UniProtKB/Swiss-Prot annotation:
Subunit structure: Homodimer.
Known function: Catalyzes the oxidation of either pyridoxine 5'-phosphate (PNP) or pyridoxamine 5'-phosphate (PMP) into pyridoxal 5'-phosphate (PLP).
PROSITE patterns for this protein: PYRIDOX_OXIDASE
Catalysed transformations (reactions): pyridoxamine 5'-phosphate + O2 + H2O = pyridoxal 5'-phosphate + H2O2 + NH4(+); pyridoxine 5'-phosphate + O2 = pyridoxal 5'-phosphate + H2O2
Protein name, UniProt field: Pyridoxine/pyridoxamine 5'-phosphate oxidase
């Protein structure tokens, strides 16, 4: 077994101060995601880990791309027959993590996932490249397959089927909006004295009210 205990580095890019924080965490999130995108350090700056829990209480994570965010929450799209969708149907409490370590930052979100309307899903689906639209029809996400060749054969079949005209939206393809109940911003600090600030909803409905802001020990 490898010993990784000697792998470490100092965090030197700067701190996060209470007086700099906006009242609305989405304002800070927008600033941070623009900075990581503009830095061009990460090839997928919108990549986030989505954690869900199954009926037995077993958590599971996967990387998903954030497609939209606003004061109502964070939006992503997926196959509605996938493991994540099945787990959300059982328990819609989820967490998101944006690991922007290149800027010595991370953002952790907790909240509830709400399924998007067909209108919202279609509005995004039509913007996808045609090959990606076809791929949505091909993959029964999270199911077992015999070999990659089976997937490629199905893709070729569906590509021929949809060679003319628009690709329709599959009924089993959709999206979710995660309405946040808390958002934590983490900025690396020297000597492991990191800065952590937690925004928590004042209103239990998750849809109204302001935010409490607390500094957390690193």
């Amino acid at each position: 077994m490898s010993n990784l205990s000697d792998i470490r580095r100092e965090y030197t890019l700067g701190g996060l101060h209470r007086e700099e924080l906006p009242d609305n965490p989405m304002v800070l999130f927008e600033k941070w995601i623009e900075q990581i995108r503009d830095s061009e350090i990460l090839p997928d700056p919108t990549a986030m880990s989505v954690a869900t829990v199954d009926a037995e209480g077993q958590p599971f994570q996967r990387i998903v791309l954030l497609k939209r965010f606003d004061d109502n929450g964070f939006v992503f799209f997926t196959n509605l027959a996938s493991r994540k969708a099945e787990q959300i149907a059982h328990n819609n409490k989820v967490s998101l993590l944006f690991p922007w370590h290149a800027l010595e930052r991370q953002v952790a979100v907790t909240g509830v996932a709400e399924q998007l309307s067909t209108t919202e899903v279609l509005k995004y689906f039509v913007t996808r490249p045609k090959e990606s639209q076809i791929a949505a029809w091909v993959s029964k996400q999270s199911s077992k397959i015999s070999a990659r060749q089976a997937l490629e054969s199905k893709f070729a079949e569906m590509k021929a089927k949809f060679s003319q005209g628009e690709v329709p939206l599959p009924k089993f393809w959709g999206g979710y909006r995660v309405r946040p109940s808390s958002i934590e911003f983490w900025q690396g600090g020297e000597y492991r004295l990191h800065d952590r600030f937690l925004y928590s909803r004042k209103d239990s409905s998750l849809k109204e009210g302001g935010w409490d802001i607390d500094r957390l020990a690193p």
